[in-house]
Amino acid sequence: MSKRCAITGKGPMVGNNVSHANNKTKRRFLPNLRTIRVTLEDGTTRRIKVAASTLRTMKKQSN
C-alpha cells in the first residue's frame, strides 16, 4: 500500500528521532491519510487516500 496522497502526491518524509542524549536514529514522518469516496464524472464511486491537509483545503475551496 502506498502511503501517498492521491491528489497532492504528499508522501513520507525522512528525519531523525533525537533522544535527550542527542543520539539520532532514522525515522519516517508519515502523512495523515484518510480514505474518502469520490464520485467520478461517469457516476461511479471510488475510494482514494487523501491527506487530511488536502481534505481541509478542498473543504475551504468548496465554500
Curated annotation (Swiss-Prot):
It comes from the Bacteria. One of its GO terms (molecular function) is structural constituent of ribosome. Residues 1-20 are annotated as: Disordered. Keywords: Ribonucleoprotein, Ribosomal protein. GO terms for cellular component: ribonucleoprotein complex; ribosome. InterPro entries: Bacterial_rp_bL28, Ribosomal_bL28, Ribosomal_bL28/bL31-like_sf, Ribosomal_bL28_bact-type, Ribosomal_bL28_sf. Gene3D superfamilies: 2.20.150.30, Ribosomal protein L28/L24. Pfam families: Ribosomal_L28. GO terms for biological process: translation. SUPFAM superfamilies: L28p-like. Belongs to the bacterial ribosomal protein bL28 family. NCBIfam families: L28. HAMAP family: Ribosomal_bL28. This is Large ribosomal subunit protein bL28. It comes from Campylobacter concisus (strain 13826). The gene is rpmB.
